[in-house]
Amino acid sequence: MAPFIPGELLPEPGEIELNAGRPVTSLHVANSGDRPVQVGSHFHFAEANAALQFDRTAARGQRLDIPAGTAIRFEPGDSRDVNLIPFAGDRRVIGFNGQINGPLDA
């Protein structure tokens, strides 16, 4: 057996579906600002940059449905549809823009 390499991933053969079975919310997002805005995979989307125009109430408690460690970049004037999925686990949101700083379901 070959030695393991630290950090090496050994996925099973075939397709891997990310976030399988999770409920998805689709929102239309537009960057009304004059600078690009990038939002990471695990950022609480409702607290994203104020230049992004979208339904923040619908985005509460959710993050982008994209692979971990990746991001979506919105160029000035850019608009697109994004898919969001709910945070799981303890559903506590701490930090980001400080709008929640506690449990989402309280």
Curated annotation (Swiss-Prot):
Activity versus pH, per record: Optimum pH is 8.6.
N-terminal signal peptide: none
Protein localization: Cytoplasm
Listed name of the protein: Urease subunit beta
Keyword Cytoplasm on entry: yes
Any one Gene Ontology molecular-function term assigned to this protein's record: urease activity
Swiss-Prot/TrEMBL catalytic activity: urea + 2 H2O + H(+) = hydrogencarbonate + 2 NH4(+)
Family: Belongs to the urease beta subunit family.
HAMAP family from the UniProt entry: Urease_beta
GO CC annotations on file: urease complex
Any one GO biological process: urea catabolic process
Pathway: Nitrogen metabolism; urea degradation; CO(2) and NH(3) from urea (urease route): step 1/1
PANTHER family (alphabetical): UREASE
Catalytic EC class: hydrolase
Keyword NADP recorded: no
Principal location: cytoplasm
InterPro entries for the chain: Urease_beta-like, Urease_betasu_sf, Urease_subunit
Gene3D superfamilies, per the entry: Urease, beta subunit
Summary of subunit composition and partner proteins: Heterotrimer of UreA (gamma), UreB (beta) and UreC (alpha) subunits. Three heterotrimers associate to form the active enzyme.
Entry note: thermal dependence: Optimum temperature is 45 degrees Celsius.
Keyword terms of this UniProt record: Cytoplasm, Hydrolase
